[in-house]
Swiss-Prot record:
Effect on the protein upon substituting D163C: Loss of both Na(+)/H(+) and Li(+)/H(+) antiporter activities. Abolishes ability to grow on high salt medium. Cannot bind Li(+)
Site features described as Important for pH response, chain residue numbers: E241, E252, V254
Gene Ontology MF term list: cardiolipin binding; sodium:proton antiporter activity
Periplasmic face of the membrane: 32-58, 117-122, 177-180, 223, 273-286, 351-357
Stated consequence of mutating K300C: Increases Km for Na(+)
UniProt protein name: Na(+)/H(+) antiporter NhaA
Known outcome of mutating K300H: Retains 52% of Na(+)/H(+) antiporter activity and 88% of Li(+)/H(+) antiporter activity. Increases Km for Na(+) and Li(+). Does not affect pH-sensitivity. Decreases thermal stability
Regulation: Activity is regulated by pH. Active at alkaline pH. Activity is strongly down-regulated below pH 6.5 and a dramatic increase in activity is observed upon increase of the pH from 6.5 to 8.5.
Organism expressing this protein natively: Escherichia coli (strain K12)
């Protein structure tokens, strides 16, 4: 029991469990004995009905859209705290992850197009390497435990949130044909209610969560990625202390173990089970996976590092306190973990064209993401000293 308590007290424990869940999913998805059970579990229908409102999704979508909204709620709370009281409190510090994220989307897309521009079909996948899987990137960073400066973790969170918002906008503009304007209207009203609650000084977390559920439902029905609702709710929950209590900090404390030990491992288990059937290493010579690998492994760190360097040189932004430019460069490598978001964009880009293209895209995403994770982790492990 003492060893178990020591493990769960470790800052790295959540990352370790997430990686184990991902490996288990890969094994089960590619084993003849367990692949059927694994896919049946993910396809299990779960229906929620309240009056005339009905949400009928399989288990995978409930995990990705509902549980991950809770994860993004926690991320929103942590980033808001740092924006108001911590390492992103000044305008120039807050601008830093925004500029980094822009570079981290533009350069990978351009590198991909350098390989695929001549092919009108594969060219449609230009957004694949522009995405970052925030859950896995943070999971790899968590493996380093207390070595990681808090400001560096917050920088990665803020960068990845902006990256995800960019990916959501790209999907809505270029890969979605059926946005529901009525649902987006309901979402806008819900956001307005959250703003009014915050301005009026409402401090009951439950009220914000209730409006957040309405917002989440509206965003889900609109065709936009529903996890966005979690970030928005997190930004509106009050942070200021009154009588020694802060609603945002209290909720952050409550959510952290649930996210670290249940939601993220479950997300990893549900999404890391990529079937390698039909995927061969011969496909690595194709321009599609080569473009994705180049975008994730080279384009992400290059774009983030270059735009950060320009921002510092032009005095548009400041480094987060307690971090170095070299650490920012390595975070750029971790942002090359595109994984689930990249696979999702690939399915939208090629799903109606050729299933073989999706297999090639998966190969490129896996190679690029795993390489980014291993290189980023190894480099940070060498560069960061263990805390005493």
């Amino acid at each position: 029991m003492k060893h178990l308590h020591r493990f769960f007290s470790s800052d790295a424990s959540g990352g370790i469990i997430l990686i184990i869940a991902a490996i288990l999913a890969m094994i089960m998805a590619n084993s003849g004995a367990t692949s059927g059970w694994y896919h049946d579990f993910l396809e299990t229908p779960v229906q929620l009905r309240v009056g005339s409102l009905e949400i009928n999704k399989n288990m995978l979508l409930w995990i990705n859209d509902a549980l991950m909204a809770v994860f993004f709620l926690l991320v929103g709370l942590e980033v808001k705290r740092e924006l108001m009281q911590g390492s992103l409190a000044s305008l120039r510090q807050a601008a830093f992850p925004v500029i980094a994220a822009i570079g981290g989307m533009i350069v990978p897309a351009l590198l991909y197009l350098a390989f695929n521009y001549a092919d009108p079909i594969t060219r449609e996948g230009w957004a694949i390497p522009a995405a970052t899987d925030i859950a896995f990137a943070l999971g790899v960073l968590a493996l380093l435990g207390s070595r990681v400066p808090l400001a560096l973790k917050i920088f990665l969170m803020a960068l990845a949130i902006i990256d995800d918002l960019g990916a959501i906008i790209i999907i809505a503009l270029f890969y979605t044909n059926d946005l529901s304007m009525a649902s987006l209207g309901v979402a806008a009203v819900a956001i307005a209610v959250l703003a009014v609650l915050n301005l009026c000084g409402a401090r009951r977390t439950g009220v914000y969560i209730l409006v957040g559920v309405v917002l989440w439902t509206a965003v889900l029905k609109s065709g936009v990625h529903a996890t966005l609702a979690g970030v928005i709710v997190g930004f509106f929950i009050p942070l200021k202390e009154k009588h020694g209590r802060s609603p945002a900090k209290r909720l952050e404390h409550v959510l952290h173990p649930w996210v670290a030990y249940l939601i993220l491992p479950l997300f990893a288990f549900a999404n890391a089970g990529v079937s390698l059937q039909g995927v061969t290493l011969d496909g690595l010579t194709s321009i599609l996976p080569l473009g994705i690998i180049a975008g994730l492994l080279i384009g992400k760190p290059l774009g983030i590092s270059l735009f950060c360097w320009l921002a510092l040189r032009l005095k548009l932004a400041h480094l987060p306190e307690g971090t170095t430019y070299q650490q920012i460069m390595v975070v750029g490598i971790l942002c090359g973990i595109g994984f689930t978001m990249s696979i999702f964009i690939a399915s939208l880009a090629f799903g109606s064209v050729d299933p073989e293209l999706i297999n090639w895209a998966k190969l490129g995403i896996l190679v690029g993401s795993i390489s980014s994770a291993v290189i980023g982790y190894s480099w940070l492990r060498v560069r960061l000293r263990p805390s005493v």
